[in-house]
Regions:
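Non-catalytic signal-transmission and effector/linker regions of two-component phosphorelay proteins
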Residues: 1-15, 26, 99, 108-127
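Short, glycine/charged-rich "phosphate-handling" switch motifs in NTP-dependent
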Residues: 104
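Hydrophobic/aromatic residues positioned on beta-strands within the core alpha/beta folds
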Residues: 85-87
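Short acidic active-site motifs
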Residues: 39-43, 65, 115
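Conserved phosphotransfer cores of two-component systems
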Residues: 48-50, 73-80
Length: 127
């Protein structure tokens, strides 16, 4: 958990490198330790070797399945929280919360990065 390392540890899984780097920079400015991965294989590898307080996860990955990443994160690290982001209206009915018990938020990809960072900080403190 964040108390062990002293910094919040965030895994960002986003297929769009520009968007992922934008989020990463905002979180780093808030003294969060971040790792950016573009797809399922990189995210799974990261989760096998490190603990993360939060996973910010693009629901529609170009490489692999976001649900597989979320399931693995929940299995490997039951305290890890998931924030899904998407640029689609898929799951806009809120059903995403029933599919993964660690899901804490579901946001549009165009959410201002400072708002996403504030949500990450909020849910990390809640752990």
């Amino acid at each position: 958990m964040c108390l062990v390392w002293g910094k919040m540890r965030i895994l960002i899984v986003e297929s769009d490198p520009d968007l992922g780097q934008l989020w990463q920079r905002h979180m780093q400015r808030q003294d969060m330790e971040t790792r950016l991965e573009a797809g399922q294989s990189g995210a799974i590898c990261a989760l096998q070797t490190q603990y993360f307080d939060i996973v910010v996860l693009d629901l529609v990955l170009k490489q692999g399945s976001a649900m597989a990443v979320a399931d693995f994160a929940s299995y490997r690290h039951p305290d890890t929280q998931i924030i899904f982001v998407t640029n689609t209206s898929f799951f806009s009915d809120g059903s995403i919360f029933a599919l993964n018990a660690n899901t804490r938020a579901f946001l549009q990809s165009d959410t201002p990065p400072e708002d996403l960072t504030a949500m990450v900080a909020h849910y990390t403190r809640a752990v």
